[in-house]
């Protein structure tokens, strides 16, 4: 059962939401357009606001549902975390798109809302505050990722817990996936949310 749920979590995470919206609505391959990501930000810039909104909601749902399925069948924190990791892995490295997917932000948010809604919404709050000030999605995502392990530690009071471990892993993973964005930020070349193309 555990292996089955982990597999389901991966395939759930690997649903290429942004790619499908790009293909069906604009006949474009997001992997070859803009930032090359299939996430909501690239959808926003190249497909439209409403498609981006739906992609974001669905991608959040992928992480949330994967963890909720695990929670339904077990009360083991480690197993919940493994299901979340599987969903995030599917989102970043989807088998359908030869391993080229999104950057784990929305799916990771869904996972943390399921694991600890306080941490999930606190991270979302940090993201929205930075976004309101900077208008730069990548900076907002990176900022939320940096704060994530600290928020989790404050919530559970321990570094020896699967939730803290996954918060640290996801933080590092999100920052790593934004490494090209970081280079542009340092050069002052990163575009803002209302810019059309990267």
UniProtKB/Swiss-Prot annotation:
Reactions catalysed according to its record: an acyl phosphate + sn-glycerol 3-phosphate = a 1-acyl-sn-glycero-3-phosphate + phosphate
Keyword field: Cell inner membrane, Cell membrane, Lipid biosynthesis, Lipid metabolism, Membrane, Phospholipid biosynthesis, Phospholipid metabolism, Transferase, Transmembrane, Transmembrane helix
Transmembrane segments: 1-21, 50-70, 77-97, 111-131, 136-156, 157-177
Pfam family, one: G3P_acyltransf
EC assignment: 2.3.1.275
GO CC annotations on file: plasma membrane
Membrane topology of the entry: Multi-pass membrane protein
Entry's localization field: Cell inner membrane
Pathway membership: Lipid metabolism; phospholipid metabolism
Quaternary structure and interacting proteins, as annotated: Probably interacts with PlsX.
Functional note: Catalyzes the transfer of an acyl group from acyl-phosphate (acyl-PO(4)) to glycerol-3-phosphate (G3P) to form lysophosphatidic acid (LPA). This enzyme utilizes acyl-phosphate as fatty acyl donor, but not acyl-CoA or acyl-ACP.
Name recorded for this polypeptide: Glycerol-3-phosphate acyltransferase
Organism of this sequence: Prochlorococcus marinus subsp. pastoris (strain CCMP1986 / NIES-2087 / MED4)
Gene: plsY
């Amino acid at each position: 059962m555990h292996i089955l749920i982990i597999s389901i979590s991966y395939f759930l995470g690997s649903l290429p939401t942004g790619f499908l919206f790009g293909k069906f609505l604009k006949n474009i391959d997001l992997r070859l357009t803009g930032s090359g990501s299939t996430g909501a930000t690239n959808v926003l810039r190249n497909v439209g606001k409403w498609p981006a909104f739906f992609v974001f909601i669905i991608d959040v749902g992928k992480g949330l549902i994967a963890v909720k399925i695990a929670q339904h069948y077990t009360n083991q924190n480690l197993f919940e975390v493994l299901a979340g990791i599987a969903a995030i892995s599917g989102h970043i490295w989807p088998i359908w798109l030869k391993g080229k997917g999104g950057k784990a932000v929305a799916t990771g948010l869904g996972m943390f809302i399921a694991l600890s809604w306080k941490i999930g919404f606190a991270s979302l709050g940090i993201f929205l505050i930075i976004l309101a000030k900077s208008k730069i999605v990548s900076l907002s995502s990176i900022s939320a990722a940096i704060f994530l392990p600290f928020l989790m530690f404050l919530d559970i009071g321990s570094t020896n817990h699967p939730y803290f471990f996954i918060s640290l892993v996801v933080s590092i993973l999100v920052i790593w996936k934004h490494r090209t964005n970081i280079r542009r930020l340092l050069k002052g070349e990163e575009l803002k949310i209302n810019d059309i193309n990267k």
